[in-house]
């Protein structure tokens, strides 16, 4: 029944290293579906460094980072990533999925609002659900729809609060602004935290998010912008930034 419904997963077995050409189930094929954009998976220098690290640290930390699993290699990597990105600090996770599950609930919670592209990755969707924030989906890569959804949401919330006389739950902003909207009268700005979240490059479609327009909207409404750039980091922009 699963096969008839198109829900049965066909697991491909890869023989050998990742590359432009790979052997799948005994057949050489062109690889168009891996994340090995920079060719690190089978790079001689990377493999040599990995072998040296295994000799020094073994094959794994054998513990979670917060207990006894953080090595000086983790710290060195995070420091170099921060330098690469030009930021104060970074933190690494086991996977992009884990990152979204951890980061989104740390930014928003009950009483806050997330504006999520309708084709965002499953990890973003799950992270938003875990946060317990209200989720508003906007049209794929559509800044006009995003602005309309934010305007509608903030005005509805403002009107409801004014009628009830209640103060909306407060989530202090992480950066700049008041986490409200500029087009409301002074003293009547909405205080819930607003988060706009999008993939940078959508892995299934290949679309690139219109980040300049999204950031402009975020600035206008006092929202935070979060970008999952798993498929753009190191690939797009000058020097991969």
Region locations from a protein language model:
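N-terminal "arm"/small-domain region of PLP-dependent enzymes with the aminotransferase-like
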Residues: 4-59, 223
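Basic, amphipathic juxtamembrane/active-site segments
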Residues: 236-241
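Conserved N-terminal alpha-helix of the aminotransferase class I/II PLP-enzyme fold
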Residues: 48, 52-96
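Short, structured coil segments at secondary-structure junctions
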Residues: 110, 130-132, 221
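Conserved Walker B
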Residues: 119, 201, 229-231
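Active-site phosphate-binding strand-loop segment of PLP-dependent enzymes
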Residues: 136, 140-165, 183, 187-227
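Conserved PLP-anchoring active-site segment centered on the Schiff-base-forming lysine
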Residues: 103-122
């Amino acid at each position: 029944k699963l096969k008839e419904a198109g829900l049965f997963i066909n697991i491909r077995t890869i023989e050998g290293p990742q590359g432009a050409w790979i052997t799948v189930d005994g057949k050489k094929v062109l690889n168009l579906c891996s994340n090995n954009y920079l060719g690190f998976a089978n790079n001689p220098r990377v493999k040599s460094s990995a072998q040296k690290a295994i000799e020094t640290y073994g094959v794994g930390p054998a513990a979670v980072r917060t207990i006894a699993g953080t090595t000086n290699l983790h710290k060195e990597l995070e420091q170099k990533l921060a330098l690469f990105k030009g930021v104060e600090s970074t933190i690494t996770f086991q996977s992009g999925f884990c990152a979204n599950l951890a980061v989104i609930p740390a930014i928003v919670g009950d009483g806050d609002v997330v504006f999520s592209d309708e084709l965002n990755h499953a990890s973003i969707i799950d992270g938003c659900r875990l946060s317990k924030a209200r989720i508003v989906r906007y049209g794929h890569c559509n800044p006009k729809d995003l602005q309309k959804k934010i305007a509608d949401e903030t005005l509805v919330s403002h009107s409801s609060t004014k009628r009830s006389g209640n103060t909306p739950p407060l989530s202090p902003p992480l950066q700049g602004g008041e986490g409200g909207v500029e087009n409301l009268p002074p003293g009547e700005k909405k205080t819930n935290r607003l988060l706009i979240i999008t993939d940078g490059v959508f892995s299934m479609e290949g679309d690139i998010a219109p980040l300049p327009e999204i950031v402009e909207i975020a600035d206008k409404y006092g929202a935070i912008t979060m970008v999952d750039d798993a498929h753009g980091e190191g690939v797009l922009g000058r020097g991969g930034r």
